Amino acid sequence: MLRPRTYVRKLAWRCPRKSQLGLRLATSVSSHKSLPLPMNFDISHSQSAFRAYQDIIHRNKSVGDDEPSQRSENENNPSESDKDSNQDPETPKKDKESENDKEPEKEKDIENDNKVSSESNENVTLASSNTGGAAPPNGNNNGDDPDDSNPSLPVDPVTGLYPPLLAIPMKDRPPLPGRPFAINVTDPEVIRSIYTIIDKREPYFVLFHVKDSNEPDTDVINKKDSVYDIGVHCQIIRHTTPRPGVFNVLGYPLERCKLEELTTPSSEKEAKSEEPSKEDAESFPTSYLKGLNVSYATVKPVEDEPYDKSSAEIRSLVESLKTLLSKMGGKNPLEKLQIKEGTDLISDPSKFADFVGSTIHGDPKKIQEILETLNIETRLSRALELLKVELKASLIKESTIHNLSTKADEYQTRLFIKEFIKELQKRAGISESEDKKTSKFDERLKHLKLTEEAMEAYNAEKAKMENQNEHSSELGVSERYLDWLTSIPWGVYSKDHFNIKQAREVLERDHYGLKDVKDRILEFISLGKVSGKVDGKILCLAGPPGTGKTSIAKSIAESLNRKYVRIAMGGIQDVHEVKGHRRTYVGSIPGRIISALKQAKTSNPLMLIDEIDKLDLSRGGGAASAFLEILDPEQNNSFVDNYIDVKVDLSKVLFVCTANYLGNIPAPLRDRMEIIDVSGYTNNEKIEIAKRHLIPEASKKAGLETNHVSITNETISRLIEKYCRESGLRNVKKLITRIFSKASLKIVEEIEAKEALDSSKEKEGVTASSEEANVNSESTKSNTSQAEPVAESSTDISTKSKVASEKIETKEKKETNKENGQSEEDQQPEPKFVIPEDIKLEITPANLKDYVGPEIYTRDRVYEFPPPGVATGLSYSTSGNGDALYIESILTHSIGSGSGVPGMHVTGSLKDVMKESASIAYSFTKSFMAKNYPDNRFFEAADIHVHCPDGAIPKDGPSAGISFTSSLVSLAINESLPPTVAMTGEITVTGRVLPVGGLREKILGAKRYGCDTIIFPKDIENELEEIPDEVKDGVTFIPVEWYQEVFDKIFPNATAQKCNEVWKEEFAKLDSKKKNKKK
């Protein structure tokens, strides 16, 4: 029994490749000869092939209904013997002889089948095109089957829908019908489904563009709203696996289609829960997609709107597209071939528009608009718009490439010419040393005295530079190194002037007071005059901000006739900022020291290391370690910068450092310095400095003379006492500058008001005179109208000629200024504003607040009559300012209530040392009271809270020890301390008073707060001798060694009986409460 070849081919497409039937069918299909198919196989192993065969028969019937033919009927309806064989597939064959007898008959049947097969295929293709499907392109399915024809899926005649097809989303630009495209699939389920539809010989799927490009990449459509409704119906041409897990599909868009219904994996799972019947599962041809975890969609073919090819609008658009496409071709043969292929489609405007949309690289959303456009004229217009943008971008790209190519050619030409000239000069023996970049460095060397090591480094780098190519990147590195090396003032020194008289005059001129500082500086200069040098000295000016440390360094430089350079240390945290970076780093430069020498242009300047206590030590102190070498006289004669990499002698440099707080400087670095204390100024010193320096400077900057604005001594004193209580003068300078600024404003407003008044009076006078002139002119009008013109006088002629010559000169000046690029306003400076001498302002204590605002310090003391438990201590801040520090102690609960817990807690941003000092004071006070006043049981029940005001300011140090003790003793005996007594000193648990620092500043702070008595440790009594009498005036000093001496001075009226019985009643109440509780 033989089957027609067409049916064999259909079965080969549907049959599993590994089965016996599939192998035989594939062999018979791939063979050019008609091979018989003996029915001796076990059909039970290939039931799917027979089901596929029945589907083919059913499909061919539906396709062939429109154009029936006898041959198609013969092909779709097998003979009765075939049916019998299908009903009984296991019927054995007859013997070989009967089979051989029918051999000629079989050959005839096969030849007829071949004819019928070809005609049937033509009929199927025609039918598919009539039902809305597009003819598939030529190609094969990955080489599995050489035959190119695939059965087209039918469109339901009632609904006009295709059966459900595999639906795949696409985030890239959507494809348009007629142009193949490629997609990568990574979802294993989708890959399995593609294999399935290929095996089923239904290699079709639908592709829809994703609306939101930010959605995660997926090969399954999870929501219908996530994709556009219009997509493309595609056929698989070829598929490959470029790498594991990636499946590449080459598809051919057949036609546009509209999404009607989408089934997602989630919706399919819900449907499965209802357990559909077997008939429902086989209700459509592609029902096998239900078993796969993919999305499939029911789509409807979309046809273009009717149009007229001969329409003028369409023809114009087509011609415009064709013209622009010819310009897009360029010089690329592949692009020319593609564009030629597209221009062949101009007879079909619809396909031509799709071709243009597929060719250009436009926005995916714009391409989707072309896909969704069914009006051909609109589609052509949108394609033309995108093509214009593409052409413009292409022209810009081409122009850019051309410009770059031209520049590269010019560069190569110049390079060739330079090298050619260089070679000619070399052949001719012409020296080119004058043209070398090293000539300027050689000129510098004539004025320098380089060390032997530096000269070797210079010669080596110079030779390296000469041998390098002109365009080498190393050339700039070598040139920059030689520039720095020759910028160091090797062997250049300024002559020192050791004139004590001149130095004293300079110091007195620039600074008032600071007698100790001036004496130390003059001693330093005198040592230099005796020894002939000042090498090896490192001075450190330590004191509060605004006390003139930087200006003192400038005065020293002027006195010695040395260059002055300043290096600010604020924020320096890296050693490379001091010693430079090595040349291996890109953009490396020398450190601050070499840069300062280059700026000074001498090897012995005065180098100010400003704010050395602000060095950042957070990175292990790298910068501080570098200064150990720089500021050590034994080492700085061979300082090596990382960039220069040559020893530089810094022993002739006079280093002067400034610091606000010496505690922030590392101890090894502090030991190398000679410390000079620059203490704060007294009020009298501030007044004199303001009169001598600050007021004249502020007056000059404001453009006012000192006789226009006068500030009395009382005003300056009030300004210092009520606004500026710090040790320095910076705030005083700011406020004086503000006074002159507001005074200038008031003076200008007063002058402008006067001028406005005068101008109004002048206008009134001019109006009156003009009225009189009008009356006189009317009276003489009749006489002058009949008079003959009189000849001009010689005076009038000379006046006119003078005016004319001035105009000519003015015109020439304007032309000259115009040629020089200067305007007339630039040539004429603004005239200085002249202030009349009768305008004067006087700044008095009464009107001072009109210029600087309300007073900051309204009273000298916080407590005029302090309550028990309040003591006045003295503090010394890191900025160098002395201040009063109040210690307040209270009882949180009354003694008689018995609700408090005996003990003490402290507040006020106290750090560890100060907390320990308070704890020591509490322990000593308990011991002191128990020893001297045993009947005073205060500490048995007292819950004490100790506080230091200004809680936002951190406080630390041991100097408040006796202040804590006095506050607790005052609370224990319930007696107040004198308001004008301040104290400072560290306390021990035995009552010994130990020395503290900053006595001078603390004295100034005590005086500012109205304290006239200061208790201090006896061990620092000798420091009083060094403090100026002006600071000590009006203050009584009480040196103490033990706390008992402090107690006797601050509580002179305290008796033993009073101190023992002060809390007697409260403890009686407490005892009675305790007894009642026991009962």
Swiss-Prot record:
Its main location: mitochondrion. One of its GO terms (biological process) is oxidation-dependent protein catabolic process. Residues 865-1053 form the Lon proteolytic domain. One of its GO terms (molecular function) is ATP hydrolysis activity. SMART domains: AAA (SM00382), LON (SM00464). CDD domains: RecA-like_Lon. Residues 61-116, 262-281, 756-765, 803-818 have a biased composition (Basic and acidic residues). Keywords: ATP-binding, DNA-binding, Hydrolase, Mitochondrion, Nucleotide-binding, Protease, Serine protease, Transit peptide. ATP binds at residues 543-550. Gene3D superfamilies: 1.10.8.60, 1.20.5.5270, 1.20.58.1480, 3.30.230.10, LON domain-like, P-loop containing nucleotide triphosphate hydrolases. Transmembrane segments: none annotated. InterPro entries: AAA+_ATPase, ATPase_AAA_core, Lon_bac/euk-typ, Lon_lid, Lon_proteolytic, Lon_Prtase, Lon_prtase_N, Lon_prtase_N_sf. It holds the Pfam family Lon_lid. The active site is at 959, 1002. It is found in: Mitochondrion matrix. Residues 117-131, 780-802 have a biased composition (Polar residues). Residues 1-60 form a transit peptide. Residues 132-143, 768-779 have a biased composition (Low complexity). NCBIfam families: lon. This is Lon protease homolog, mitochondrial. It comes from Debaryomyces hansenii (strain ATCC 36239 / CBS 767 / BCRC 21394 / JCM 1990 / NBRC 0083 / IGC 2968) (Yeast). The gene is PIM1.
